[in-house]
Amino acid sequence: MAYSYTERKRIRKSFGNRESVLTVPYLLQMQKDAYTAFLQADRAPQKRTVEGLQAAFENAFPIVSHNGFVEMKFIEYNLAKPAFDVRECQTRGLTFASAVRAKVQLIIYDRESSTSQSKVVKEVKEQEVYMGEVPLMTDKGSFVINGTERVIVSQLHRSPGVFFEHDKGKTHSSGKLLFSARIIPYRGSWLDFEFDPKDVLYFRVDRRRKMPVTILLKAIGLNPESILANFFVFDHFRLMDSGAQMEFVAERMRGEVARFDITDKSGKVVVAKDKRITVRHTRELEQSGTTTISVPEDFLVGRVVAKNIVDAETGEIIAKANDELTELLLKKLRLAGVQDLQVLYTNELDQGAYISQTLRADETADEFAARVAIYRMMRPGEPPTEDAVQALFQRLFYNPDTYDLSKVGRMKFNARVGRDDSTGPMVMTNEDILAVVKILVDLRNGNGEVDDIDHLGNRRVRCVGELAENQYRTGLARIEKAVKERLGQAEQEPLMPHDLINSKPISAALKEFFGASQLSQFMDQTNPLSEITHKRRVSALGPGGLTRERAGFEVRDVHVTHYGRVCPIETPEGPNIGLINSLALYARLNEYGFIETPYRRVVDSKITDQIDYLSAIEEGKYVIAQANALLDDSGTLTGDLVSARENGESVLVGAERIQYMDVSPAQIVSVAASLVPFLEHDDANRALMGANMQRQAVPVLRPEKAFVGTGIERVSAVDSGTVVTANRGGVVDYVDATRIVVRVNDAEALAGEVGVDIYNLIKYQRSNQNTNIHQRPIVKIGDKLAKGDVIADGASTDIGELALGQNMLVAFMPWNGYNFEDSILISERVVAEDRYTSIHIEELVVMARDTKLGSEEITRDIPNLSEQQLNRLDESGIIYVGAEVQPGDTLVGKVTPKGETTLTPEEKLLRAIFGEKASDVKDTSLRVSQGSQGTVIDVQVFTREGIVRDKRAQQIIDDELKRFRLDLNDQLRIVEADAFDRIEKLLNGKVANGGPKKLAKGTKIDKAYLADVEKYHWFDIRPADDEVASQLESIKNAMEQTRHSFDLAFEEKRKKLTQGDELPAGVLKMVKVYLAVKRRLQPGDKMAGRHGNKGVVSKIVPVEDMPYMADGTPCDIVLNPLGVPSRMNVGQVLEVHLGWAAKGLGQRIGDMLQAEAKVAELRKFMDTLYNKSGRVEDLANLSDTDVLEMARNLTTGVPFATPVFDGASEEDIMTMLKLAYPDDIAKAKGLTATRTQAQLYDGRTGDQFERTTTVGYMHVLKLHHLVDDKMHARSTGPYSLVTQQPLGGKAQFGGQRFGEMEVWALEAYGASYTLQEMLTVKSDDVQGRTKVYESIVKGEHAITAGMPESFNVLVKEIRSLGIDIELERS
């Protein structure tokens, strides 16, 4: 097994017993692939497939004018290179986007020589037209919109197609099941079919008024005869003078009650009247050769005629199809000489007369009348002209412009109606409508099953690409309308395509979607995990989806098909539970947008290496074993019965029936849930909290890897993009805190390309949640790297692994009530060592605008401020970087012109004498808000085009250019060094014709000569060999070309920086100041483990008072043991035991290093540690240096991986504890025989506690619910407009609500005065509170309570009900 550069440094010991057959796929694949397919930027225009932007253009074009003589055709589109890169867009507040330019042709046909069949081209104009800007996806799968990072969440919506369901008996009081069907297109009108309680079948379009379904059937060209022929089988009768002969069909008779004596040919009574006809009776009739049965007259009465009956002589219709037979009608038929009669066969059980009843309720006569009825329903009040009626009906279901079933919809439709072919037209056909009605009638007859709408085979995912394409289509559709109207003018006027196309509608549609759609969300950037999870989220909400209020329990519930596709654990608590889900670890989307999950093929009980991805629909056909099924050494399933899933049910089956097997035990959960060790031992509710709270962990100053992990930490850190990985292999040439320079391997460098990769690290960058994004290099000069190796850690990562919290020594015991109700007791040492100190970065913005009274100005010259208050501002009025600021300090000086005030003559005189202008402006400087303090870490100044830059802005630009020049110099240095190395190899030992320093002709060039000559003069050497000379010339040209390209790059950068900035309307200058705030852990901060065990810090206790162990080690955290049993999250206890072993093993390795043990001894110990259980590690492949470096990294604790559902057993934990704490160490630490508990001592008294305590290491996180952000006190603040009561909440500087229950409490205590002031002067007694303020100012303490405003509001509300109420003052 080959280890990457970073993995070698610290190998995580895994307890997983199952070999990994499939590595975890790239976690942002879904987002990236979807958007790549949408843009198709890397494909040549001719090779683009019809999807994404290409499909949108092909759908909108060609546009033909109303007269048909002008046409606009689409040829291809191109994407321009974005003007600014991602970082520049973030700092400047721009959108990272690319301009779309479409090449279109305007074709004008010749009116005179064109005919309706063939048109003659008069002229063709081709031009590239700007078609708006499309936001580009960053490497991390997010978008930068107006300077902020956003994520487009994928939407889980009901797939297009046809669905059959029933109301579960809820609609009608009798509990009768009312069946319905719905045809849902991707775009267009919905078509519903539904039964009413009287068994009449109706249809409705777009949920409008319902109409009998036979109207629709007539509208598609069926007459009553063909309708009945499609839905019924017929009974045949031959009329006699009295009664009739009925054709005998055995299966129709069986189970019926005979209404008359049934006789065979010979006249023998086989079934007596009122007896049920059984199989024996029908067999007897068949054996006697009976083909017809005599039936009495009344048996015919009430039957329904199947076809029109026409008098052969007169041509008159005697009976219409669907007429009921009566005695009178039978008489008529006999008189007309009709002998053969066909009637509908119906029964109560499985052949209902539903369509026949519906036909009777339908009064339309023919196809046109039916279409008119539909027109009236769709357009009530409009006159139904023939053209309008036909056009509307065509538009509803048959026009590809207005109706699109989509590939998915057609595939699902065909599959549901039982067709083998998955392709077909994208519009409805008459056969489709008929097929749906047939299946619905079959369902009502008791045949077939209704669909489960929560099945993931009926719900598909709409990704970023698809959502963006839909928006682009809407924009193009708006353009199409406008262009169509203007195309006619192109014949008379010399117009070009760009005169006709206005790209604003496209830009507006995309802007609205990316900026304001419910699915475009502000990226959760608290830590790397929250970023990944946000991008892998699947939401059922959003446009075209569900709403929180309407979503029932079934939609939110875990469904059997979620297995391996959607995580059953990770979902928000609260109103969105179950509506927002997370994609499972190995899941992916297929071409139709259905979620697939991988399985291993099993052939004859033997596991193969073939991996198939199955969607929820396909999975139902197979028997699938779990990943933990027992296998022998050859990979064959053992045991008589194997636990498996078949059709969504858990079953035990024989090994020979298994067709597939899960690829990994972790395949059912999401990334966040798979990071919880011992997840299998936690209750589901707590696991949900644990998975969710990891996303809220604040990145701390020094991240520390978790002792107990699951093995997914590395994958999630690398895929999140927070760490820096090597793009190509090579050698580290230079490292400092801000950049890493790598000289690329020759094999990986492209011909004629700079073989240098420069990685500029992010330093103290603000995230969306104000946390700190900061990268630290983890490589040294000379390190050899391979592609994909981690070279720098980011926020919350430690040597390339996700590290969300800190490992804390935890003791489970009560401590003086300070850990009552999940409170957490923490040692002062944790705070002193800055273990949970985090940096938060706040962005403060000030803008200088152009006002009516004149321009605002950013300046140091501010009225009424002392020099002391201005001493940290530079001459431009902007604070220095590095200044430490307190609440109220000025960050940026700004003055605003004041309105002219009328001056007294004396003031005018003084003003004339002293030239006093200061009173014309007022101070509107940017100051540090209350409750925040910190260090200024960055300042950015943006100036509008045409306004002179101040010194500070110029200095910022110069610094940026200096940094850029440094990068280019580094690249040039390496390129030149590389080139001169190659020249030296090329010339050494070659014969020269002459050269610098009077090199004689025929002399051999050696290294000594080359060292003596200045390197740049090597090009003047004239080698005798022409081949060598040409190579030397090409190297020289390549170097000059590189130098020239670098100069161009520098110029471009300078141009970008010196051009004016795009600022909002009316803004002349904008300054952004970034403050770094250090937040130490304090009481009130929320902390949590990974098992849903959360709590608030109640007290920070001096180290000496904390409980300590026999060897004097004090605990870091004391948790309440009562938090475990009722919560049923036992995983935390197992984590603590294994963490305790991890620490002990690290200490043993540390002791060995201190004792300077031989490498062989270290290898032997590591082999015992890594390879006695779980996954075997290839330690023999590591060099001695690697082993020593790894040992040094392990001294703080050996990291373990206990994969989800395949983790460490109790036995494994015990083995590790024994290895970590041999008897002598265990005794010194006061551990029990099992090493899971220790004897602790009270830090305050030194007394031994009564019994042993569970002690160990737990990975504890500090969550983003910090007391500093929540603490708030109101003095005098804003009031609500209507009730005049103080507002609520910190953001509004609101008060604390003294509610109903609090009033009861004061009433109970009889505190009448307190109650009075609470309800009046402290709340909404306007006069009263003003008087209180006045009296406090005067130093008095009198209260005169008046009428609360809310009472007046109540009086007004009662009056609004028409009740006259007034307050009579006595």
From Swiss-Prot:
Lipid biosynthesis recorded as keyword: no
Annotated coiled-coil segments of the chain: none
Q: Which reaction does it catalyse?
A: RNA(n) + a ribonucleoside 5'-triphosphate = RNA(n+1) + diphosphate
Q: Which GO terms describe its molecular function?
A: DNA binding; DNA-directed RNA polymerase activity; ribonucleoside binding
User: What CDD domains is this protein classified in?
Assistant: RNA_pol_B_RPB2 (cd00653)
GO-annotated cellular components:
DNA-directed RNA polymerase complex
Please cite one Gene Ontology biological process associated with this protein: DNA-templated transcription
Q: Which InterPro entries does this entry report, sorted A to Z?
A: DNA-dir_RNA_pol_bsu_ext_1_sf (IPR042107), DNA-dir_RNA_pol_bsu_external_1 (IPR019462), DNA-dir_RNA_pol_su2 (IPR015712), DNA-dir_RNAP_su2_dom (IPR007120), DNA-dir_RNAP_su2_hyb_sf (IPR037033), RNA_pol_bsu_bac (IPR010243), RNA_pol_bsu_CS (IPR007121), RNA_pol_bsu_protrusion (IPR007644)
UniProt keyword list: DNA-directed RNA polymerase, Nucleotidyltransferase, Transcription, Transferase
Q: Which top-rank group of organisms is this from?
A: Bacteria
EC identifiers of the protein? 2.7.7.6
Q: What does this protein do?
A: DNA-dependent RNA polymerase catalyzes the transcription of DNA into RNA using the four ribonucleoside triphosphates as substrates.
Query: How does this protein assemble?
Result: The RNAP catalytic core consists of 2 alpha, 1 beta, 1 beta' and 1 omega subunit. When a sigma factor is associated with the core the holoenzyme is formed, which can initiate transcription.
Q: Which HAMAP family match?
A: RNApol_bact_RpoB (MF_01321)
Family, as annotated: Belongs to the RNA polymerase beta chain family.
Q: What is this protein called?
A: DNA-directed RNA polymerase subunit beta
Ranked from the top, the taxonomy reads: Bacteria, Pseudomonadati, Pseudomonadota, Betaproteobacteria, Burkholderiales
Annotated gene: rpoB
